[in-house]
């Protein structure tokens, strides 16, 4: 990737961080970088193309963050707990980016790189779950099913927090405890 393209992505990332996804426009990006609008379009076909590149980068960041969080953890259940806490924290710290990654459907044909990056992250989680199953630490269900269950749980937990439905009266105010409890439900 060339410098200008990466700088365009960095400016876009800052715009999302400061003003949300709706604050991003090709014209505004060009202005911030002192480029003509046509110069921006030489690197990205449109705003959607640029956002797709950001999403791929976000998945790479999440994957890296997960990798760093599990270094040195040998216990499969503790490893899964670390992954889920990492997902949760990533979502909260990067709300708009998380919504861009998980809150919209990306066309597989038009943006295969987004699909590949998302699937790589899913497959990484599935591999850890499969390993935990091999070691007889979690329930014996098809790996795809158990991974889908884990994904549904953690994404639901993040979305409940985003919506402000993490009230103590519902028992939703302690995500780490909920993650631990969820894992105890799938342990053998």
Where are these regions (language model features)?
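Hydrophobic/aromatic-rich alpha-helical bundle segments in the mid-to-C-terminal region
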Residues: 103, 111, 133-181
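A short, glycine- and basic residue-enriched loop/turn
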Residues: 5, 21-23, 38, 47-48, ...
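Short, structured helix-loop boundary elements
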Residues: 5, 26, 48, 52, ...
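Short secondary-structure transition hinges
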Residues: 93-127, 134, 168, 172
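Short hydrophobic/aromatic patch on the recognition helix
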Residues: 34-44
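An amphipathic alpha-helix signature
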Residues: 81, 85, 122, 126-130, ...
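Hydrophobic alpha-helical connector segments
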Residues: 53, 57, 67-96, 146-150
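Basic, helix-initiating cap at the start of DNA-binding domains
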Residues: 1-19, 23-28, 32, 49-52
């Amino acid at each position: 990737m060339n410098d200008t393209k990466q700088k365009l992505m960095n400016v876009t990332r800052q715009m999302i961080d400061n003003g949300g996804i709706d604050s991003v426009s090709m014209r505004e990006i060009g202005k911030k970088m002192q480029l003509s609008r046509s110069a921006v379009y030489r690197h990205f076909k449109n705003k959607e193309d640029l956002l797709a590149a950001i999403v791929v980068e976000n998945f790479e960041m999440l994957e890296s963050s997960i990798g760093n969080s599990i270094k040195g953890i040998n216990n499969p259940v503790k490893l899964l707990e670390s992954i889920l806490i990492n997902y949760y924290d990533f979502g909260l710290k990067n709300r708009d980016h998380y919504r861009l990654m998980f809150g919209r459907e990306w066309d597989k044909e038009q943006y295969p790189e987004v699909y590949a990056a998302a699937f790589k992250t899913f497959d990484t989680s599935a591999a850890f779950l499969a390993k935990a199953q091999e070691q007889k630490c979690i329930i014996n269900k098809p790996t795809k099913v158990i991974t889908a269950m884990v994904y549904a749980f953690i994404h639901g937990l993040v979305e409940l927090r985003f919506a402000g439905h993490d009230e103590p009266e519902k028992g939703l105010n302690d995500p780490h405890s909920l993650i631990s409890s969820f894992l105890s439900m799938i342990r053998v």
